[in-house]
Amino acid sequence: MHFSTVTRDMEAFTASSLSSLGAAGGFPGAASPGADPYGPREPPPPPPRYDPCAAAAPGAPGPPPPPHAYPFAPAAGAATSAAAEPEGPGASCAAAAKAPVKKNAKVAGVSVQLEMKALWDEFNQLGTEMIVTKAGRRMFPTFQVKLFGMDPMADYMLLMDFVPVDDKRYRYAFHSSSWLVAGKADPATPGRVHYHPDSPAKGAQWMKQIVSFDKLKLTNNLLDDNGHIILNSMHRYQPRFHVVYVDPRKDSEKYAEENFKTFVFEETRFTAVTAYQNHRITQLKIASNPFAKGFRDCDPEDWPRNHRPGALPLMSAFARSRNPVASPTQPSGTEKGGHVLKDKEVKAETSRNTPEREVELLRDAGGCVNLGLPCPAECQPFNTQGLVAGRTAGDRLC
């Protein structure tokens, strides 16, 4: 397999096919149970109307509708009304309806299973939120899939993109614990595609293990030059997963639309935020994130109940355990900087522990939030926004 072939396929897919994908459609998974936290959805648009072609004989039936919903919407600006059709004898029917592209056999039989579906469903019932930062933040839950039906000896690329669910901007109403429409969406962010770092690879390699997009990061920095996915905060997005067959033919760009297949799992849609809004989402992330062990070691009653930006009931519990209070071996005071503090000084020192000060008490010299656990060489980044006042982008959780 030549590098030029892979490059051609990537360019053809990105420039031709992906640009014409719509937010709706794909090969969706089963809808998640429970009520939608964003309220009732808008009714689906009516099915397209197919008018008979002007060149067809009188009385001849027009083109039949497709047997199932075609996964991709027409490109932006494409003519959809009958008035835009060419007129006169011999006019083409192409403007009236675009026939579905027959998929290459290498991708037609591919199927995908979403991993951790039960967890995604649980988040979806609450209204999933994903943190976006200037530096980029990984998703949790991580998007992971299991693949079936690939040609073991064929080469495939796996990639993801994110499309807006609607044209609205949202805000969270804390008094009602619900999301409300705040207005029209902000201008669209630059569309980007995230290729799995193992792409391209043989079908046998993709199918033998779970495929994880744990390197994918979300950012709200419009000038990002690190290749992260750029999203608008307080907007809803739908992740999409694409399987692309690496066609060895020299003119493979001609077959770009038939060489890929898209999968959409509605339970993975989320709202991009800079700090968690729903405290139940915060609790569920703490309970289910393997890198949040330090938070789970505390009493669940210490978890934030009435969440608001800057609230710090959870971190305060840990900070108090590290404050310079009197111990049995030091009944009359506490050592600080080589001398003993009297009880009054201890009380004054403790009273100055504002939320920002408490975070500094918990953060070691390496910028790692120390929750009393051994700090490994590489701490997994963990989002403390919405939990910790005075947080910094470098905070990590041990």
Swiss-Prot record:
Molecular function per GO: DNA binding; DNA-binding transcription factor activity, RNA polymerase II-specific; protein dimerization activity; protein homodimerization activity; RNA polymerase II cis-regulatory region sequence-specific DNA binding; sequence-specific DNA binding; sequence-specific double-stranded DNA binding
User: PROSITE patterns, from UniProt?
Assistant: TBOX_1 (PS01283), TBOX_2 (PS01264), TBOX_3 (PS50252)
Where primarily located? nucleus
Q: Where in the cell is it found?
A: Nucleus
Q: Tell me where on the tree of life, at the top rank, the source sits.
A: Eukaryota
Identify the keywords attached in UniProt to this record, alphabetized.
Developmental protein, Disease variant, DNA-binding, Nucleus, Transcription, Transcription regulation
Q: Where is the composition biased (Low complexity)?
A: 29-38
Protein name in the entry: T-box transcription factor TBX1
Q: Which species is this UniProt entry from?
A: Homo sapiens (Human)
Gene encoding the protein: TBX1
